[in-house]
């Protein structure tokens, strides 16, 4: 450790971090080259270059301040009923926030041939319920409250400390009903299919028609509820908590999502808590790394296609594919030669081997980003919201 001191921007540093660092340098060089030429409007090169440039433009970000979130924040603080709340929750979910609960589509755990709609416990600003409930985390809760107070102050809210305390109290009530990490490991206990009718009747504090419409989720028959009793508690909180508390909670969640892409003052406050206090980082990542990570995340396959064209040509991929095929052939021959395995079992083993799918380096068909619009005339945050919504849909 003395010979290899931890870099201040890292909370940990290992072999995979070295590989990631090397790739970040390569990707940054590719992005820098893109900014030096004029790409065709609508091309992935234009989208990558514009996102990267906006992320680097600290002067513009600082000039805009928190103006990019003003319209959304005003809508959040104007929420007056269940329908408006449900619409705002959907909007924040589309922008990568996570208030009240988490919704997503993934393979059905009991039938991998199907995709299923899932709803899970989510919505805690600090993520883990233990941060709210364990006495040993009292100091962390104070720092979290300080972050919220700072964020609300920078936005210009009245009584920011009081509002921050209300958010922490609300999230603590949620955390009390969250399942522990150990309980979440029980797959069967966290797989609870419900019909759409039963689901919307049981959790009636949310206007699900408005929510699903806002999320772009069409009609469905069944939804998998991860933690029914947790959602019961959230449902009750939405019914009984003052509307002002719900608004402020949504505002806190929204600002935490937006802060890394706004002016330096709010990002510094965000980093102080989420980077330094929560993760142990001593310094912010350099701006170029933060700017580079955005198009790399949102346009990952487009970046990958450009990357492999330079660093992993088709000829290298085919060599690796052939190597894997050789291994498959060798394994097949090995199965046939086993004297302790019955013919029926060998046939099953060969059948299983034949289903092996080879994926090397990059896909045969790349994701199409043509319908995603990146407009440099809009703010950085507005573009990220649009991109996140596009990706979620």
Locations of regions flagged by a protein language model:
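Noncatalytic, helix-rich "gating/capping" subdomain that lines the substrate-entry/channel surface
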Residues: 26-322
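Short capping/connector residues at structural and topological boundaries
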Residues: 11, 106-108, 122-124, 129, ...
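Secondary-structure junction/capping motif
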Residues: 13-18, 42-43, 195, 207, ...
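Short amphipathic alpha-helical segments with coiled-coil-like heptad repeat character
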Residues: 2-9, 149-159, 355-357
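Intrinsically disordered, low-complexity linker/terminal regions across diverse proteins
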Residues: 173, 202-205, 224-228, 285, ...
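Generic secondary-structure boundary/loop-capping signal
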Residues: 3, 114-116, 338, 371
